[in-house]
């Protein structure tokens, strides 16, 4: 069989794994790349390559070797200038090289949103040294949030509540940085009512949206998500307006995870990822088309006739608590048995080869067909608590 398309996937984590499954169901041939062998997406891909995405020569060599129809980034730390070179030669970078460059760096996408598009954001400043960060914190005020301009899954992110905490926050940010840009963004803390992810799909036929996803974070990383999340119709429309403005400015086709803070009637842009979002894993059970299906269809130019919600749904993460390369996952059978009637449960184990504290090793999914979002959240959390990692 001749594949419908060849995809070079740059980054092979759990989000990439689900994307590979969706793309292969549509006939694509996928080459999964990452810095270590046996990464989750590699286990289900057609081929695999192991190299650092920050090695420009190795990245170019992989592109030259496989000659993909689409280059699909799944991680933040990539030599984006190499992607721009190949896009200029006629290759398709998803969603576009410009979008990848802008969104892989928090400062650049913030400038697009705040300066170019005039969208509401928190007050912010940048710092490249400890002294600059002390000055930025003094000007922004405390409490404030410090994030590396390039990182993932909340790494390096912390809340500074007083001037005494600045030095430790700088060290933590530097330790959590990806890439080679030693720069942080210092944001005024917003006492928001809640935060959401609006999955926004840019297709050749226009922009479509999933229902807003609520989520809870710890240490800057998602712990649980749910869909739908209660919002006023006005707030939903404002989030859609902002999301469409940003993705249309970035261009290209694919799914974007657009994050917002909501405070009263105010909808405030936070961040954007040009790919499936971790909080969007709830769509594996909540929708007829998951975020991974939607990303694959948008990339391949396939139609998305409708996005249907099955009912109140939730996801909860399964985390490791120590470093190990020899471990087992127990309790999956117990996790799949609901404690209440009317609940559907599922589990995704990511098959990562090693653990470390707080590393995401799996996720539980719950659908409350005749219940509430709170019922789904409780079921997902209860299921996650039953899955245990046993270290040998």
Please describe what each predicted stretch is:
Residues 9, 102-197, 201-246, 384:
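Active-site nucleotide/adenylate-binding loops and adjacent lid/helix of ATP-dependent enzymes
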Residues 237-258, 263, 273-325:
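Active-site "cap" helix and flanking loop/linker of ATP-utilizing ligase/carboxylase catalytic domains
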